[in-house]
Amino acid sequence: MNYPKLPSFRLDGKRALVTGAGRGIGMGASIALAESGANVTLVSRTEKELKDLTDHINSQGFKASYQVLDVNNEDEVSSFINNAEPFDILINNAGTNRPAKLIDTKIEDFDYVMSLNVRSV
């Protein structure tokens, strides 16, 4: 079966920011944006993952940089925003979960999950 192909999707000259970029959906989105021509800034709490992904993207001839950042930390986020150049694209992908039944979840864990998944966006 033949499917129609979409025209080439280009983001040349655009600046993109991806939170939670170190793995999973964030990693995939970062690679796709870079392959489409965007200059991608990767954000996560884990420097090794960010460095490895940045090196991978740049080694393919695309543009990426990274910033270690906890999007749940207001001071870190404010500092980052105040020092960053404007972005054209924002992918708020940072998120987490605590694998437990809600009835068994500690309030501290619940608050952390809600803060990261809702407020950080």
Labelled PLM ranges:
Residues M1-K14:
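Flexible N-terminal pre-Rossmann segment of NAD(P)-dependent oxidoreductases
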Residues K48, Q67-S79, I107:
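The beta1-alpha1 cofactor-binding region of Rossmann-like NAD(H)/NADP(H)-dependent oxidoreductases
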